[in-house]
Amino acid sequence: MSRATKVVLAYSGGVDTSVCIPYLKNEWGVKEVITLAADLGQGDELEGVRKKALDSGAVESLVIDVIEPLIKEYAFPAIQANALYENRYPLATALARPLIAKILVEAAEKYGADAIAHGCTGKGNDQVRFDVAIAALNPQIKILAPAREWGMSREETIAYGEEYGIPAPVKKSSPYSIDKNLLGMAIEAGELEDPWVEPPEEVYGMTKAIADTPNEPEYIEIGFERGIPVSLNGQEMGGIELITKLNQIAGNHGIGRIDMIENRLVGIKSREIYESPAMWVLIQGHRDLESLTLTADVTRYKRGIEETYSQLVYNGLWFSPLKGALDAFIQQTQERVTGVVRVKLFKGNAMVVGRKSDNSLYSFDLATYGAEDEFDHKAAEGFIYVWGLPTRVWSEKLRG
């Protein structure tokens, strides 16, 4: 029995999504498979994707450049939210998934497809991100996930593909699964599945080993307008150029490497290796500029919801009502987050060592201990008495 007639398949050119093409046609009775690959700035990974899809049995192969919306509509809001999943992961992969889901739905509607398919397994987070985002954008469209059902091991998947002329792309000497876009890389599988094993240097593609980084620090200046990075070292530039250059600069100093045990949505712990040089530096710089321009209560409240925001993105709820509500709050907080931060890059560390803003709430005359001090020291005694009054009353009652 046919699962669908015409399917738009999220396509990467890898073995799993390539095998999906003959599998959908031969096992599930799909008549036409249209592949869609998103150009997210992953570079040469997309070379030959169109030809490979057509050779694997697709009737049409689409490659859509979405680098600019990835930066403007997904990365920049995440920077404004200081989004770090479990305080470490800048969400490079997770941010791309709702964007891919969006263009999949648009393509399905344009080509009259009755289903969308992806090659995610039943063990990872991406299946959730795709399914939930697609359902949010078009609840009527059917979602097919062959890899969730076919029950084939990695070796069996490769063998199935070879029956239909699909070559295995992963050599025994390089068993890693890699997801890359302009925001960063995610590396897993192979020996990395042992959390005790140090990742070999060969897995990294965006950052230098600390031993190979410069022996002198490099200082950079990042300009922000309303929480969005707009300049690097005094030169205004668009988001793509800025992140590309900052990836190179920060990566040269070994910044942005993350080795973590992360809690997946499906209930398991996973060892993940990430590289995200630019996003790491931008979030550190943005967070510091907020400390200069936001009031204490707004800062504390915003810090409290940043982890919630990160969890929503990680868990595939980009298009959820709560995410929309948090976006509205965050945008309001960014009205005055404009200024420049100076960052010292050295041996894997990005340290903010200077910040300035026309909206700065820092008052030298109030903060200084020098002769210019204008703080009313005498007012402190009354403030302390009132501030500590509840504790004083509690203590008196306790002592009887």
From Swiss-Prot:
GO terms for cellular component: cytoplasm. Its EC number is 6.3.4.5. It is found in: Cytoplasm. It catalyses: L-citrulline + L-aspartate + ATP = 2-(N(omega)-L-arginino)succinate + AMP + diphosphate + H(+). Keywords: Amino-acid biosynthesis, Arginine biosynthesis, ATP-binding, Cytoplasm, Ligase, Nucleotide-binding. PROSITE patterns: ARGININOSUCCIN_SYN_1, ARGININOSUCCIN_SYN_2. It comes from the Bacteria. Signal peptide: none annotated. L-aspartate binds at T121, N125, D126. Pathway: Amino-acid biosynthesis; L-arginine biosynthesis; L-arginine from L-ornithine and carbamoyl phosphate: step 2/3. One of its GO terms (molecular function) is ATP binding. One of its GO terms (biological process) is L-arginine biosynthetic process. ATP binds at A10, Y11, S12, G13, G14, V15, D16, T17, S18, A38, G119. Its main location: cytoplasm. It holds the Pfam family Arginosuc_synth. L-citrulline binds at Y89, N125, R129, S177, E262, Y274. The keyword Protein biosynthesis does not apply. Homotetramer. HAMAP family: Arg_succ_synth_type1. Belongs to the argininosuccinate synthase family. Type 1 subfamily. This is Argininosuccinate synthase. The lineage of its organism: Bacteria, Bacillati, Cyanobacteriota, Cyanophyceae, Oscillatoriophycideae.
